[in-house]
Amino acid sequence: MISTCITVAGSDCSGGAGVQADLKVFTAHSVYGMSAVTAITSQNTIGVNGVHLIPASYVEQQISACLLDVHCEVMKTGMLFNQQILKVIVESIDRFKIKKVVVDPLIATRKGALLVMPDYLELFVKELIPRAEVLIPNIAEALIILKHMTNEFVEIHHLEDVKAVGKKLIKAGCKNVVIRCDDIPFASDFFCSRETNMPPTWYLYVLCTSEGEVLLPQKWLASKTARGTSCALSSAVASNLAIGLDLVTATQNAVSYTQRALEMSFHLGRGANSLDYASALTRLPYEKGEFINFVRYHPSITPKWLSIVNHPFVEQLKAGTLSRLPFQKYLVLKYHMLINNAQAAGMMAFSSSSISAIEHSAKIIQAIKEENVTHLRICEQYGLSASQITKSKPEIVKSHSLFIHDTAQQDGLRGIQIAMLPFVFMIQEVVSQISASDGYPYVAWVEHCKDKSATSHIETLLESLETNSQIISLSKVQHLLGILEKSLDFERLVLDTSSSNESSVF
């Protein structure tokens, strides 16, 4: 069933913000979007020159028309304008049992000028914030809300000050907060660049939860100013929650989407740039949780995979008739390819500006390190010394190194994980079927491939790919299939090289 989301916000006739922007974002994430308009505005890329409020009763009528007909568990709110409309929203959340509410406050400009009346702010804090799954204010709004809730004020000089604001908001009653540091560029040391005279490096997003803070720095784009970035971010978070992602992943993906939309923004009118909301436009050819099955059984993949499972090496491995030398060659080649994967993950971490991507790269490296320790021990059991394994790199290993490094540079963590799938398939569909009974020559290797440590690493890799497979373009899916095809070619080449009497591996 298709995921749904409703936005309650103002209308922007020029399409750059408001419900028009929200609906574009929903569509780009393959989420069916509905809307309730709170005001009709006359605006363009230069500015707003007219606002016509919709009566609160008619806002309620719009919401009811949608939600009495279509099941929806996620709501995104934008500009609500007055107390009457705000009360309608609160009542609708309760009436329709909306599970997750994403709130873009829109109570102040980036400079901190208040856009709403004090009585609105009072009701906003008292009634809407407690119902919000996540609040997504700019830093000025976060400070205003904090002042209202706790009478505290924090001066922003460094990243740690932003985190402090988030912690205080959580302590004051906000469930989760994503702070957008609009108009404040940060230097490479995470101090405000305007105070240190250092060149701007980072645009900061900070996700704050009861469990801690997640820093999501993005490259500062000095030449890119565009309308609708808050709409894009909050609607992307709502979309990701609607398709079932957890909040951290939903926010990470939303930040990446917003950054990409900003990077690809274009000059359409005479004022600010227009975001490329369609930068992730896709109708994915698989359902949630079916990405791995989709790529495994894709028509371009199946013939290559069959050429592997029907390879004489694999047939003999399953039967227990594979001689020692081909198996030794296979172990050596697999060792080098694991090292290549670890090096590519390390290179990706070194060049990444995303803390979460660095963390995931580190996990891959740690998993490969643990695997290699066991792998070397197994190699020794089958008559291979450490010097035999490491002293030289066959040509296939050098070619694989170029491939996996290029993949890491172009496609990051997801590309590396896709390139690791052939061996995952080998374990799942070949090794798991081998009965390593008495007399089977490679019991230690089979048992290792089946043990809890190995299967746990595989499960983590597959879960990561599934989680991140909902927010990619169709062209990216095709590109990833291309990576998998090349990786399967290398897997086949490993089998050919291991089986060949003419090839030298050690």
Swiss-Prot record:
Outline what the protein does.
Catalyzes the phosphorylation of hydroxymethylpyrimidine phosphate (HMP-P) to HMP-PP, and of HMP to HMP-P.
> Its family?
In the N-terminal section; belongs to the ThiD family.
One example GO MF annotation: hydroxymethylpyrimidine kinase activity
Q: Which GO terms describe its biological process?
A: thiamine biosynthetic process; thiamine diphosphate biosynthetic process
The highest taxon in the source lineage is: Eukaryota
UniProt: 4-amino-5-hydroxymethyl-2-methylpyrimidine binding residues: Q43
Named in its record, the pathway it takes part in is: Cofactor biosynthesis; thiamine diphosphate biosynthesis; 4-amino-2-methyl-5-diphosphomethylpyrimidine from 5-amino-1-(5-phospho-D-ribosyl)imidazole: step 2/3; Cofactor biosynthesis; thiamine diphosphate biosynthesis; 4-amino-2-methyl-5-diphosphomethylpyrimidine from 5-amino-1-(5-phospho-D-ribosyl)imidazole: step 3/3
Residues of the signal peptide: none
The listed locations are: Cytoplasm; Nucleus
Q: Enumerate the UniProt keywords alphabetically.
A: ATP-binding, Cytoplasm, Kinase, Nucleotide-binding, Nucleus, Thiamine biosynthesis, Transferase
Q: Which InterPro entries match?
A: Haem_Oase-like_multi-hlx, HMP/HMP-P_kinase_dom, PM/HMP-P_kinase-1, Ribokinase-like, Thiaminase-2/PQQC
Please classify the protein's predominant subcellular localization into one broad category: cytoplasm
- Catalyses which reaction(s): 4-amino-5-hydroxymethyl-2-methylpyrimidine + ATP = 4-amino-2-methyl-5-(phosphooxymethyl)pyrimidine + ADP + H(+); 4-amino-2-methyl-5-(phosphooxymethyl)pyrimidine + ATP = 4-amino-2-methyl-5-(diphosphooxymethyl)pyrimidine + ADP
> Its Enzyme Commission number?
2.7.1.49, 2.7.4.7
UniProt entry tagged with the keyword Transmembrane? no
The uppermost taxa in this organism's lineage are:
Eukaryota, Fungi, Dikarya, Ascomycota, Taphrinomycotina
Presence of keyword Transferase? yes
Its recorded name reads: Putative hydroxymethylpyrimidine/phosphomethylpyrimidine kinase 1
Naming one, the record's GO cellular component terms include: cytoplasm
